[in-house]
């Protein structure tokens, strides 16, 4: 049975979240029993081939989220609001969030940062019944302004900014906060200070949940190993080897065999000559 926001906030075990971007990935995640699925704007990197998440559009997110919902009808679904969809004012943000919920069947939206403008958006969405997941630490949508894709919160100013941002997101109405690429001790402090669940990615074991990117945990891209992710399979290698085996058999006329071919009666064939 799909969990509700109160279920997630009161969970006694660590929450398990994984990204999915399409129907088969969503089916895998739901069958595995995860608590939440995130349709992340990371699809720009791992699915669409962009070098950042910035080019991802709202239409991209809706297209992929609809497929994910069809594959996982019984799992709590969170959809990222991509860059630019909540940065031009509360009215635009509300319109875009409503569109995501209506057109995808998502249960919540996620956005990055804790600036006063973002906090206003979180508050308006939450007060109007749209659950919001926050995100502090490394924020891929604005990573250039943070000095690139690197660990945040290592010095006092950055650590304090991350802590205060998480607290502000909770106060604004976020039901959960993602902590990305921050020291484990800082993540533990934030988790202890918040009443809503923290979900970590590269933030240590003391968060109240964890999230990994589907392609990272399955090893779909050979050689693309990240410190904040663990590979639980090497499907990229298996896929490459399988396609190479198929190519060899085709070129050697070993595929298809009789097992993959259909028959025709001799008398029917004879009438065609």
Swiss-Prot record:
The active site is at residue 180. One of its GO terms (cellular component) is cytoplasm. GO terms for biological process: pantothenate biosynthetic process. Pathway: Cofactor biosynthesis; (R)-pantothenate biosynthesis; (R)-pantoate from 3-methyl-2-oxobutanoate: step 1/2. It catalyses: 3-methyl-2-oxobutanoate + (6R)-5,10-methylene-5,6,7,8-tetrahydrofolate + H2O = 2-dehydropantoate + (6S)-5,6,7,8-tetrahydrofolate. It is an enzyme of class 2 (transferase). This is 3-methyl-2-oxobutanoate hydroxymethyltransferase. It comes from Deinococcus geothermalis (strain DSM 11300 / CIP 105573 / AG-3a). The gene is panB.
